[in-house]
């Protein structure tokens, strides 16, 4: 029953949170895990800090994003699926013609119903992800049709990267490290399966 409990936490609470390398969604995720284990510690590292061969990126958060056609119909809304936005997209708020918009739309022709997961952590870029079926619907619009494009995202150079850790002491000084990622949103493998299994293991060994 305990494993089922953590499965339900993942399904009902973690799956819907938008997460990336940094941001509010990560903190919410870690706080949900902490609510289950008081020994769980949430740590933070400042954006810009050098960690081995990596530099902590600016904190990225997004409030909303959508595409609206000439009839004021919302043909894509970030609220419906976290995968609809390229991770770490730059903000944009403008009208674009069809061909220009299509340059920033990603899909999977061989999996026409699936939404791809795309990121652009280190290159300044913005983009949308949708099923290939959705993309084909946009292609049906006239060449001169314009679309209202909005990505309300922000970068904070004074932000943080957050991570969580817990140490369960055993009978010896030897350690076994178990790690999991939380940075990919709305996917079962492994940014949902990882935290669920990790919570189950914490409960089992403590």
Name what the model sees in each region.
Residues 1-206:
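N-terminal hydrophobic/helix-forming segments and targeting peptides
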């Amino acid at each position: 029953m305990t494993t089922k409990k953590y499965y339900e936490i993942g399904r009902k609470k973690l799956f819907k949170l938008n997460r990336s390398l940094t941001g509010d969604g990560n903190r919410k995720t870690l706080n949900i895990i902490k609510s289950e284990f008081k020994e769980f510690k949430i740590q933070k590292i400042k954006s810009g800090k050098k960690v081995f061969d990596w530099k902590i990126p600016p904190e990225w958060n997004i409030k909303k994003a959508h595409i609206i056609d000439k009839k004021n119909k919302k043909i894509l809304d970030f609220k419906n699926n976290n995968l609809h936005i390229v991770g770490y997209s730059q903000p944009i708020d403008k009208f674009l013609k069809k061909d220009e918009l299509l340059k920033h739309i990603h899909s999977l022709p061989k999996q026409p119903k699936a939404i791809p997961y795309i990121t652009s952590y280190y290159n300044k870029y913005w983009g949308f992800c949708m099923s290939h079926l959705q993309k084909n619907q946009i292609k049906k619009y006239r060449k001169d049709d314009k679309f209202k494009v909005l990505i309300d995202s922000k970068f904070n150079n004074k932000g943080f990267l957050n991570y969580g850790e817990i140490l369960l002491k055993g009978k010896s000084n030897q350690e076994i490290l178990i790690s999991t990622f939380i940075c990919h949103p709305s996917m079962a493998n492994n940014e949902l399966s990882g935290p669920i299994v990790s919570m189950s293991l914490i409960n089992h060994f403590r």
